[in-house]
Amino acid sequence: MGLETEKADVQLFMDDDSYSHHSGLEYADPEKFADSGQDRDPHRLNSHLKLGFEDVIAEPVTTHSFDKVWICSHALFEISKYVMYKFLTVFLAIPLAFIAGILFATLSCLHIWILMPFVKTCLMVLPSVQTIWKSVTDVIIAPLCTSVGRSFSSVSLQLSQD
């Protein structure tokens, strides 16, 4: 119990060669990915998901568990994270990809065939609507506002302090 003086040898056998004992998976450089296979996150959308054991469980300097407990909990954390991710992707990846594909196809279709023609039609009609609106404001609203303004301009207030 206490501060570790020896370096513990922990080995986890996984099919990923990029496993790190420090913080979960180590992400290789893009050049290394290009040679070894397909880069599944080329735009680094999920770079914030580099979550390791030390990010979740941490013991302060004043209180440490037994070294073997710390090593076993670290190994169990990494194994359970790896296995649960694989298990969840087996059951959720295909249905969620299917739903996302339907959603994006629907949104693309609506944007291409409904929204953009509507916007273009509005932009074509707007110059004539603008001309009609300018005529209505010049004929009806401008004289009304002018007469109300003249009526209120003749009102004067005098304050007296008695």
Curated annotation (Swiss-Prot):
Keywords: Cell membrane, Cytoplasm, Golgi apparatus, Membrane, Nucleus, Phosphoprotein. It is a peripheral membrane protein. The modification Phosphotyrosine is found at Y19, Y27. One of its GO terms (molecular function) is protein heterodimerization activity. GO terms for cellular component: acrosomal membrane; caveola; caveolar macromolecular signaling complex; focal adhesion; Golgi membrane; nucleus; perinuclear region of cytoplasm; plasma membrane raft. May act as a scaffolding protein within caveolar membranes. Interacts directly with G-protein alpha subunits and can functionally regulate their activity. Acts as an accessory protein in conjunction with CAV1 in targeting to lipid rafts and driving caveolae formation. The Ser-36 phosphorylated form has a role in modulating mitosis in endothelial cells. Positive regulator of cellular mitogenesis of the MAPK signaling pathway. Required for the insulin-stimulated nuclear translocation and activation of MAPK1 and STAT3, and the subsequent regulation of cell cycle progression. The modification Phosphoserine is found at S20, S23, S36. This is Caveolin-2. PROSITE patterns: CAVEOLIN. It holds the Pfam family Caveolin. Phosphorylated on serine and tyrosine residues. CAV1 promotes phosphorylation on Ser-23 which then targets the complex to the plasma membrane, lipid rafts and caveolae. Phosphorylation on Ser-36 appears to modulate mitosis in endothelial cells. Phosphorylation on both Tyr-19 and Tyr-27 is required for insulin-induced 'Ser-727' phosphorylation of STAT3 and its activation. Phosphorylation on Tyr-19 is required for insulin-induced phosphorylation of MAPK1 and DNA binding of STAT3. Tyrosine phosphorylation is induced by both EGF and insulin (By. similarity). InterPro entries: Caveolin (IPR001612), Caveolin_CS (IPR018361). The keyword Nucleus applies. Residues 87-107 dip into the membrane without crossing it. It comes from the Eukaryota. It comes from Pongo abelii (Sumatran orangutan). Belongs to the caveolin family. Residues 1-86, 108-162 are cytoplasmic. GO terms for biological process: basement membrane organization; caveola assembly; endoplasmic reticulum organization; endothelial cell proliferation; insulin receptor signaling pathway; mitochondrion organization; negative regulation of endothelial cell proliferation; negative regulation of skeletal muscle cell proliferation. Monomer or homodimer. Interacts with CAV1; the interaction forms a stable heterooligomeric complex that is required for targeting to lipid rafts and for caveolae formation. Tyrosine phosphorylated forms do not form heterooligomers with the Tyr-19-phosphorylated form existing as a monomer or dimer, and the Tyr-27-form as a monomer only. Interacts (tyrosine phosphorylated form) with the SH2 domain-containing proteins, RASA1, NCK1 and SRC. Interacts (tyrosine phosphorylated form) with INSR, the interaction (Tyr-27-phosphorylated form) is increased on insulin stimulation. The keyword Phosphoprotein applies. It is found in: Nucleus; Cytoplasm; Golgi apparatus membrane; Cell membrane. Coiled coil: none annotated.
